[in-house]
């Protein structure tokens, strides 16, 4: 070991040293000695050196190609969403995998090139560092402990138990906040529910109770009567009887006055229990409540004045969705899903009270004010042979606010 590690060198002495001398001095100042060093290719123009350089160059070139491929994919690949059955679905499906493949090729190839360069070109050496036995000097230990104690005492945190608990809880919650997003990988949000589709849809954003119409189920426009189960108190305590209670009933056109609105829900034919089909022994209350609680089931049935109906502007492809003066629009606002529960008969505007979006009922539910950007979806309706209003099809677009997979 050099005896000059503690020497104070002047500028002139340092200037007189070569680069090798300065490098050796630097290691000695850290108590490190280079005991052995061997060049990988001591002979000039060694064929093995050329092969090593070629292998490193190949991996580096692959990394560059991967980076270029990533940029080309990111900029020019058809990334716009395509639904099932649409042209270009395969290209859209490959967009994210191609980003991963090209970026992975770039990073891994450059990493391999770096490792190979170190293994094949950096000289092989053995370095020895002096081991410092025993603890640090007493003065270093005492002063370090004193500084830590002083920091703790001057912070006054030791006597603030409430703040200690809050800070500790905040640290725990911060950790959970970092880990919690991983929960999105546990459940597939597009996996349909177990079992067949019911009056609440299949659990995905594409469906609602009205989707049952596509499966051949006859759906009436059900009016909510507000009927509730009857309460009875017996020896076993209070219980509720739902037999014979019909929460939803069918509607005829004459049940709705001009310039008025009614909220309706999908009522499957098998769950009808009103009028000439009423049976006091049937229990359909639970099914009716499921329809009412369906997250995208609520529909506004609007009857326009005859004069107003003559001024309606139909949406292209939806000219036959109405029945006379009757128009049915989804009650789920296209902004963030609030209920558009207000209808202004004088102006024929549908209002969302949450964020003040307004939709023109005479212009296919087009937004005319507020943050909503899309028209309210329209439900095709007609009447059956008995004169009851029924759904004449399903909505032709997803209901509610926008989400990543929808096109508009």
UniProtKB/Swiss-Prot annotation:
UniProt-annotated location(s): Cell membrane
Q: Tell me where it mainly resides.
A: membrane
Give the membrane topology, semicolon-separated if more than one.
Answer: Multi-pass membrane protein
Q: Provide the Gene Ontology terms for cellular component.
A: plasma membrane
- Signal peptide (UniProt feature, chain positions): none
Binding-site positions, [2Fe-2S] cluster: 333, 335, 352, 355
Q: Which cofactor does it need?
A: [2Fe-2S] cluster
Keywords (alphabetical) are: 2Fe-2S, Cell membrane, Disulfide bond, Electron transport, Iron, Iron-sulfur, Membrane, Metal-binding, Oxidoreductase, Respiratory chain, Transmembrane, Transmembrane helix, Transport
Q: List the disulfide bonds.
A: 338-354
Span of domain Rieske: 293-390
- Cofactor: how and how many bound: Binds 1 [2Fe-2S] cluster per subunit.
Recorded GO molecular functions are: 2 iron, 2 sulfur cluster binding; metal ion binding; monooxygenase activity; oxidoreductase activity, acting on paired donors, with incorporation or reduction of molecular oxygen
Give one Pfam family, short name only. Answer: QcrA_N
- Organism superkingdom: Bacteria
Give TM segment ranges.
56-76, 98-118, 166-186
Q: How does it assemble?
A: The cytochrome bc1 complex is composed of a cytochrome b (QcrB), the Rieske iron-sulfur protein (QcrA) and a diheme cytochrome c (QcrC) subunit. The bc1 complex forms a supercomplex with cytochrome c oxidase (cytochrome aa3).
Q: Which family does it belong to?
A: Belongs to the Rieske iron-sulfur protein family.
Known function: Iron-sulfur subunit of the cytochrome bc1 complex, an essential component of the respiratory electron transport chain required for ATP synthesis. The bc1 complex catalyzes the oxidation of menaquinol and the reduction of cytochrome c in the respiratory chain. The bc1 complex operates through a Q-cycle mechanism that couples electron transfer to generation of the proton gradient that drives ATP synthesis.
UniProt-recorded name of the protein: Cytochrome bc1 complex Rieske iron-sulfur subunit
Give the species: Corynebacterium efficiens (strain DSM 44549 / YS-314 / AJ 12310 / JCM 11189 / NBRC 100395)
Provide the organism lineage as a comma list. Bacteria, Bacillati, Actinomycetota, Actinomycetes, Mycobacteriales
Q: Source gene?
A: qcrA
């Amino acid at each position: 070991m050099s005896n000059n590690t503690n020497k104070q060198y002047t500028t002139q002495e340092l200037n007189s040293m070569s680069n090798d001398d300065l490098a050796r001095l630097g290691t000695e100042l850290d108590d490190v000695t280079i005991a052995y060093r061997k060049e990988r290719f001591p002979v000039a123009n060694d064929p093995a050196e050329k092969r090593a350089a070629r292998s490193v160059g190949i991996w580096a070139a692959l990394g560059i190609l991967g980076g270029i491929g990533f940029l080309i994919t990111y900029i020019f690949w058809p990334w716009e969403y395509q639904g099932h059955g649409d042209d270009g679905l395969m290209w859209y499906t490959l967009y994210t995998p191609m980003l991963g493949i090209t970026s992975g090729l770039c990073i891994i190839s450059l990493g391999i090139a770096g490792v190979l360069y170190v293994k094949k070109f950096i000289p092989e050496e053995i370095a020895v560092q002096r081991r410092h036995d025993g603890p640090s000097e007493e003065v270093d230990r005492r002063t370090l402990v004193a500084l830590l104690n002083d920091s703790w005492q001057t912070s006054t945190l030791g006597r603030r138990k409430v703040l200690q608990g809050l800070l500790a809880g905040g640290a725990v919650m911060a950790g959970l906040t970092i880990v919690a997003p991983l929960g999105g990988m546990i459940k597939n949000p597009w996996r349909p529910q177990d079992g067949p589709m019911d009056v609440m849809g299949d659990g995905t954003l594409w469906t609602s109770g009205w989707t049952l119409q596509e499966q051949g189920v006859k759906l009436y426009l059900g009016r909510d009567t507000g009927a509730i189960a009857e309460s009875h108190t017996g020896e076993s305590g209070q219980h509720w009887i739902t037999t014979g209670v019909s929460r939803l009933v069918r509607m005829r056109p004459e049940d709705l006055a001009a310039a008025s609105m009614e909220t309706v829900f999908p009522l499957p034919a098998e769950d009808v229990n009103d009028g000439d089909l009423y049976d006091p022994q049937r229990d359909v209350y639970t099914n009716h409540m499921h329809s009412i609680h369906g997250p995208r089931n609520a529909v506004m049935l609007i009857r326009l004045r005859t004069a107003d109906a003559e001024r309606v502007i139909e949406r292209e492809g939806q000219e036959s969705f109405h029945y006379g003066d009757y128009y049915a629009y989804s009650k789920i606002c296209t902004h963030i899903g609030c209920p558009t529960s207000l209808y202004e008969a004088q102006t024929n505007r549908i209002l969302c009270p949450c964020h003040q979006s307004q939709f023109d009922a005479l212009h296919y539910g087009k937004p005319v004010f507020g943050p909503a950007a899309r028209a309210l979806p329209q439900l095709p309706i007609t009447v059956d042979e008995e004169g009851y209003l029924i759904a004449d099809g399903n909505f032709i677009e997803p209901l509610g606010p926008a989400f990543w997979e929808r096109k508009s």
